[in-house]
């Protein structure tokens, strides 16, 4: 573990204002206001990104997506974390092993890229590994879902995630790939009508 991370004061100073709100480029210190701006701004950027039909080939693309979604708000957007991360009782991949996690995901993406269509379990596997990797301070779920949605588009598919994140988060925290697969739906991408 990075020695500095053991010092929670270091962590607070790096990421948080004194009231506990994430430090941000807009200097918003009200957590509710920040959350509202973050969700709206990241959502608009996500839609814009999907319309560009980018090819997904590695975790490098996830870093770019995270930077697009959150770079307007956070200095650390798109940067792989260099510290240990625990949320509640969930521990994510140790920082010292992050490169191994990235390699595993990249290898799976390369393996799946040659397939015409992917199954729910293929996306569930990647979603599980991305969740455990948890490469960023915040925004991991949204950027991972966008990353996989773009990867699905590369295969002429669309992923429908459940309306409520609760069951999906539980399945991810339990690393239950079968449960994750049962919660997502993979459909053929609708073709645009010719005018």
Residue ranges and their predicted role:
Residues 1-195:
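FIC/Doc superfamily catalytic core
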């Amino acid at each position: 573990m990075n020695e500095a991370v053991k010092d929670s004061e270091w962590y607070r100073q790096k990421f948080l204002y004194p009231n506990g709100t994430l430090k941000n480029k807009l200097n918003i210190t009200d957590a509710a206001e920040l959350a509202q701006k973050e969700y709206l701004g990241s959502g608009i950027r996500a839609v814009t990104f999907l319309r560009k039909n980018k090819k997904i080939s590695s975790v490098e693309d996830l870093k770019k997506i995270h930077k697009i979604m959150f770079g307007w708000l956070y200095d650390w957007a798109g940067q792989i974390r260099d510290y240990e991360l625990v949320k509640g009782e969930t521990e994510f991949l140790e920082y010292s092993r992050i490169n191994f996690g990235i390699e595993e995901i990249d290898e799976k993406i390369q393996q799946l890229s040659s397939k015409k269509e992917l199954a729910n379990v293929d996306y569930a596997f990647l979603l599980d590994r991305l969740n455990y990797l948890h490469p960023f301070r915040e925004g991991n779920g949204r950027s991972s879902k966008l990353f996989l949605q773009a990867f699905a588009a590369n295969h002429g598919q669309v992923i429908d995630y459940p309306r409520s994140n609760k069951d999906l988060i539980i399945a991810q925290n339990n690393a239950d790939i079968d449960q994750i697969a049962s919660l997502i739906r993979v459909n053929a991408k609708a073709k645009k009508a010719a005018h």
